[in-house]
Amino acid sequence: MRSYEKSKTAFKEAQKLMPGGVNSPVRAFKSVDMDPIFMERGKGSKIFDIDGNEYIDYVLSWGPLILGHTNDRVVESLKKVAEYGTSFGAPTEVENELAKLVIDRVPSVEIVRMVSSGTEATMSALRLARGYTGRNKILKFEGCYHGHGDSLLIKAGSGVATLGLPDSPGVPEGIAKNTITVPYNDLESVKLAFQQFGEDIAGVIVEPVAGNMGVVPPQEGFLQGLRDITEQYGSLLIFDEVMTGFRVDYNCAQGYFGVTPDLTCLGKVIGGGLPVGAYGGKAEIMEQIAPSGPIYQAGTLSGNPLAMTAGLETLKQLTPESYKNFIKKGDRLEEGISKTAGAHGIPHTFNRAGSMIGFFFTNEPVINYETAKSSDLKLFASYYKGMANEGVFLPPSQFEGLFLSTAHTDEDIENTIQAAEKVFAEISRR
């Protein structure tokens, strides 16, 4: 068994300093019933904790590090730009460069606004949708996470298409009432919602691949159906590609599935590991944003040279071939883990999209939040602890996906499969 004594000590101190001892809830490792592991450094596909333990990393800072940790070109570019200044509160040329690259690769984006987080991007996109259409309501999907903005922290009530209830204390019911929540991958529910509220729905926001219920791809025709319905009612279709952007495909999920939204939210990968967000879309809509239009949005560190540089150097290194390699690595990982899970009688289902992988402890197809919740959470917790002990770092939640990077090697994949074999063998003996 590995020692985590230094992590335990650090966590005890952190609990006196921060709510729950962490700066983001999932990092507390509560769903796997263990104390969090404190990390010290990373290189390539590996991450190292403060006790000196080494892991193959499939968290990758929750997605941004698509090139792996401390990529040489990204690090060198950051060193150079930091010598000139970390932030100016004035425009820089690197903002133009990253914007051009995003516009070139993301089909829906004609104009883009940089911000500092994914939450900021989605909140701004919703304000824009409401301001542009003159409507109030937003339709979202159960289990799709769009950051912690008040109008998006909503769960579904009873019935097929209901007005939301706050999912967190501190979210006023008045705000929640303007959010409609329906099941993911259920077009009929969307149609019913529009029949009832369509004239007041400003936009539909959706993760084109749901990444916060464990990676759930859209079913055939779902995204196109959303496109058709929103066009019929004059609502905006907003793709939240904070997670899927440049992870599903070279041209993002919208390029892969061939459905173009009105607005797109980005983050994670486009910052290369630094805080970032962006939203963009059709010029006629984006030009409503201040200072060219009346809809206000601003940010002190928006477009800061560090994040722009890291994002630019990251995207420059991604090619269409990168995504073919992600598919090959994912194929081998799924094949190997499925084989050993089946041999030990472990229920399991894989969902995948580009470099994103969902692994559930159920034999049932996972197509929405309800089916995702059928996964055996106790089994997941046992698997998580076992894999960590074998040197594989996974997201400490069943409802988060695994991420591949260009730094993951064939040896990493085989070692992960071997670790899973040991863990499943131990679980099956209990």
UniProtKB/Swiss-Prot annotation:
Keywords: Cytoplasm, Isomerase, Porphyrin biosynthesis, Pyridoxal phosphate. It is found in: Cytoplasm. Its EC number is 5.4.3.8. NCBIfam families: hemL, PRK00062.1. SUPFAM superfamilies: PLP-dependent transferases. It holds the Pfam family Aminotran_3. Belongs to the class-III pyridoxal-phosphate-dependent aminotransferase family. HemL subfamily. One of its GO terms (biological process) is protoporphyrinogen IX biosynthetic process. Pathway: Porphyrin-containing compound metabolism; protoporphyrin-IX biosynthesis; 5-aminolevulinate from L-glutamyl-tRNA(Glu): step 2/2. Homodimer. One of its GO terms (cellular component) is cytoplasm. PANTHER family: GLUTAMATE-1-SEMIALDEHYDE 2,1-AMINOMUTASE, GLUTAMATE-1-SEMIALDEHYDE 2,1-AMINOMUTASE 1, CHLOROPLASTIC-RELATED. PROSITE patterns: AA_TRANSFER_CLASS_3. The keyword Lyase does not apply. Gene3D superfamilies: Aspartate Aminotransferase, domain 1 (3.90.1150.10), Type I PLP-dependent aspartate aminotransferase-like (Major domain) (3.40.640.10). It is an enzyme of class 5 (isomerase). The modification N6-(pyridoxal phosphate)lysine is found at residue 268. This is Glutamate-1-semialdehyde 2,1-aminomutase. InterPro entries: 4pyrrol_synth_GluAld_NH2Trfase, Aminotrans_3, Aminotrans_3_PPA_site, PyrdxlP-dep_Trfase, PyrdxlP-dep_Trfase_major, PyrdxlP-dep_Trfase_small. Signal peptide: none annotated. Its cofactor is pyridoxal 5'-phosphate. It catalyses: (S)-4-amino-5-oxopentanoate = 5-aminolevulinate. The keyword Zinc does not apply. One of its GO terms (molecular function) is glutamate-1-semialdehyde 2,1-aminomutase activity.
